Amino acid sequence: MYENHHPNTPEVTQEDMNQLFTPFNIGKVQIKNRFCMGPMGISGIQGSLQDWNDVVQEYFLERAKGGFGLITTGVLFTDTEIDYFDPKSMKSPLHNPTVFRRGAERLVERLGAYDTKLFCQASMGVGRTAPGFKTPSSLPIYSIPSMTSTALTTDEVKRKIELMVKTAELYKKSGVHGIELHAVHWGYLLDQFVMAMTNRRTDEYGGTLENRMRVVKEIIEGIHQTCGDDYPISVRLGLKSYVKAFNKASLTGENEAGRTLEEGVEICKMLESYGVKALSVDVGTYDSFYYACPPAYMPKGHGLKLYAKAKEAVNIPILAGSRMGDPWICAKALRDGQADAFVLSRPSLADPEFPKKTELGMPEKIRPCIGCNFGCIGRVEDQGLPPACAVNPRAMRESFYPPRKATT
């Protein structure tokens, strides 16, 4: 029996918690509940062919068994020509479409046993967040500000758009239920096109917000033409940047040099008009990383007031991410109309059974993400190692350490 002992949400009722297990739709795809496993990179655990081997399969399957209604893969890069990612470390489905399709079809079938849907991310690139990659304009590199990037030519931009569309076509042929565009958030390449501070172009892809959004619009139009209007597209969107300048964050959000909330809400409306079926929202960029990947001292649910503004502006689902690993806060946000579903990335690493424990009336049994950023993003960004979790030693190693029956 559910009992609410949460000090911050004493008014959350059993009925509020039950609503987390009602279905919702992304386009024509029905998701069984309001819990979505968020996208996280899986570099380092794929096989030599960059296939979705047993390690990858069991990692995702564990979250399906734990009750997640939607799983969104970590970023899959699409460019194999202009920014050529090493296939040994940065998986692109277009490096070997046959191998990708084989693994994706198997994963979709296995997830289906738990009525879990699969969306795959597709990325145009990382831009200035790492050295050696092209950007909308010549920009200082995030980690090495003394270095500057090379701007993409107009022809290169158009080719990158074509490769995004080609990847979406492969996803649909592989049985993947939908695509999430990565990403108008965190300051990745698409985000750099959309933000005025990183887009100083003078061609059709620069200038006004409409022009800066043109890359995103043309990708969406291409997917509709290739895959049909009913193939659902989600967009990962940062509603506000919290930056003062390159490599300078703004904790309070004052003197915003990146995306303001007002512009973020306007982008939501534009994306809906383009035919996007859901928005997966958060805040922050690499330049304000404590917002993009908030540590323990950032309060849970810190972005909900901003997400509510997006929800008021559009009629498509708002999937709320960033420190949402608290079922009471999720239930209250759903009840109060601040979001439609909840994107749990690090919390799904910490406890794959987060939804199931909530549904069974045992939310206090959830192993919480502690927001340390050490085992997950820290290993990837700082050490170049595969992700892990400080509180769950089986995370991304499920195939090596299968569950065992208790001996007592």
Question: Predicted regions span which residues?
Answer:
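Flavin-dependent oxidoreductase catalytic cores
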Residues: 1-408
